[in-house]
Amino acid sequence: MVRYFQKVMRRSEVDVAYSEGFSPHQKMSFASPLSVGVLSRGEYFDLEVNSTESSKVMLERINAQNAEGVEVLSYKLLPDDAKNAMSVVAGADYKVYTDLFNQNMLDAFMNQDQIIVLKKTKKSEKEVDIKPLIYNIKLEDDGIFMQVAQGSASNLKPDLVMDAFAKFAQVTLPEYVTYERIDMYCLEDDNLVSLDDIGGNIE
């Protein structure tokens, strides 16, 4: 996605700031990498620009260069003291499209004192209680909605939750399950706030 949007910024003639040095690159950073195969309608990236027009004009210019299925929904000016999106992400909403579970299964799963999973990293693997990292989870008509910890401090992938849920409920997940990231959040006064609520439109 980084390379894609770098090309879009060039084609839409956004006055992007570039790094200095031997190999200058656009000053762009995404809030949280999207796992391969995961859909999304809630991605965010920071972009440093030298100059800009109004949010309305910039959205029109950028979206005119976007491929079908990709749309930039907001273009906002961040406060001078704002940290980059990657460093402030604290949570994310996901939708898992499946009809294999019912409310009784979900209630029993979440009523456990702990939800222990084996979390693997490149260097090791260890048992982790992921229950505190599941902020909200509920059954919906077309699948399961969950809000989980996301970011540098704590990061819980939705497929890890679903693997634990399926094992608990003695359900076999199909090889391919559709996951969609809906939104991402930062913490403000111990409350999760959508990244889209940070900053303001440029008039």
PLM regions: where:
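Short, flexible, solvent-exposed loop/turn segments with mixed acidic/basic and small polar residues
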Residues: 34-38, 82-88, 134-140
